[in-house]
Each structure stands twice: as C-alpha cells, then as structure tokens.
C-alpha cells in the first residue's frame, strides 16, 4: 500500500508541483523524492517534526484536490493504456507493417513524455 501511495504522490507532484508554494514543494521533494524522514526535514528547515507532518498532509490533500478537479494524472494514465492497447493490437494483427510500427513508436514516445 505504501508503494502505491508513494507512486501516486510522486506522480501528482510531477503534474501539480508548479502549483505548490516553495515550502510545500521543498517538503514534498525531500519527503517523497529524496526519502527524507520528517525529522530530517524538520532539522533542515528548523521547524518541528509536527509542522512538517502537518504541511505534508495538507499538501497531499491539495494534490488530491487538484487531481479531483483537473484529472491530468487520470487522463495521462488512460492515454497511456489506450496507446499500449493500440500498439499490442497492431503488433499482433499487423506484425509486418513497418510504417504502422514506426508511427506507433512515435505516438508511444510522445505519450511517454
């Protein structure tokens, strides 16, 4: 469960990080990106561990709220799944079509960005 939460928070952070304050951005980058503990972040910013905990929880809630309203991450996932399905279908039914294969590689590369 923890791995899924970390993946989700990192993904939401990638999409909505620019909407966060500098402090929120820094705390989440250290906590999720660099795997700092609450105590290490508290020491780094000269605040209490509880202050860091509260800030991170509020920021997580903000990220979830952004996703609830904008759906950028959900749309990204759906788009990637659709492209994967299309690529799989084309490889199965049109394995010798080099032009189609090249086009699908380009589409897959664009959706991965």
Curated annotation (Swiss-Prot):
SUPFAM superfamilies: Sigma3 and sigma4 domains of RNA polymerase sigma factors. Coiled coil: none annotated. It comes from the Bacteria. Pfam families: UPF0122. InterPro entries: RNA_pol_sigma_r3/r4-like, UPF0122, UPF0122_fam_protein, WH-like_DNA-bd_sf. Belongs to the UPF0122 family. Might take part in the signal recognition particle (SRP) pathway. This is inferred from the conservation of its genetic proximity to ftsY/ffh. May be a regulatory protein. This is UPF0122 protein LSEI_1603. The lineage of its organism: Bacteria, Bacillati, Bacillota, Bacilli, Lactobacillales.
């Amino acid at each position: 469960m923890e791995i899924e939460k970390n993946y989700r928070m990192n993904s939401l952070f990638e999409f909505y990080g620019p909407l966060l304050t500098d402090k929120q951005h820094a705390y989440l980058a250290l906590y999720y990106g660099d795997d700092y503990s609450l105590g290490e972040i508290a020491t780094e910013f000269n605040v209490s561990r509880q202050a860091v905990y509260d800030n991170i929880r509020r920021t997580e809630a903000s990220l979830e709220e952004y996703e609830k309203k904008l759906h950028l991450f959900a749309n990204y996932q759906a788009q990637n799944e659709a492209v994967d399905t299309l690529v799989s279908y084309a490889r199965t039914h049109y394995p010798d079509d080099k032009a189609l294969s090249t086009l699908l590689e380009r589409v897959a590369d664009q959706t991965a960005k």
